Amino acid sequence: MEIILRKEYSKFINYWLITLLSFIGIIVVVGGLTRLTDSGLSITTWDVVSGILPPLTDKQWEQYFNLYKEIPQFYLLNQNMSMSEFKVIYYWEYIHRILGRILGLFFLMPLVFIYIKKIFNKKYNLNFFILFLLILLQGFIGWYMVKSGLVENTTVSHYRLAIHLNLALILFSAIFWFFLNINSKSN
């Protein structure tokens, strides 16, 4: 029988995988609420590092609001939007993006530990590395989706949205499969 992981780390791995599954579920729900509140286009830039912090001053809020005013969603649908209304939609998108970043870090940091401690066999190491690449791809697809609504449309491309959601479901399914597989092999 093939050994997938070192037995002494099985509890740690189970907690990690369950937390990842929960996190993906939360991100999908927040993403759905972002979509339902038409908030997805409120952040018109993709600042992977500097976008970690939301606007903190009135001047920064004005800058972000002015960027939003340049896209069709604002000037065709939301011309009368106030700053306080903009902040609401901004925070929905911001929370969705920050949760994605946290998920990426929460996946990567234990993965580095897993590689250092050689917890998984080589096959599973490769599988989890591929999952990490898919998480990075998910962030890029999210931006690719948002970008589709910044120029000519007032919403994002439904096709890109479907790709974004389906990749989240693929990630969830793969992690759940690993969880089940690891636990069935360890019994």
Please name every model-derived segment.
Residues K7-S10, Y115-L126, S184-N187:
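Membrane-interface helix-boundary motifs at transmembrane edges
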Residues F12-L17, K122-F132:
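Membrane-interfacial loop-to-transmembrane alpha-helix junctions, especially the N-terminal start
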Residues Y15-I52:
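N-terminal signal-anchor transmembrane alpha helix
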Residues V29-R35, L136-N153, S184:
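C-terminal ends of transmembrane alpha-helices
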Residues V49-P72:
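Long, glycine/tryptophan/cysteine-rich extracytoplasmic
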Residues L67-F107:
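Individual transmembrane alpha-helix segments
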Residues L103-M109, L165-I182:
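Hydrophobic cores of alpha-helical transmembrane segments in multi-pass inner/ER membrane proteins
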Residues E152-H164:
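Non-cytosolic membrane-interface motifs at loop->transmembrane helix junctions
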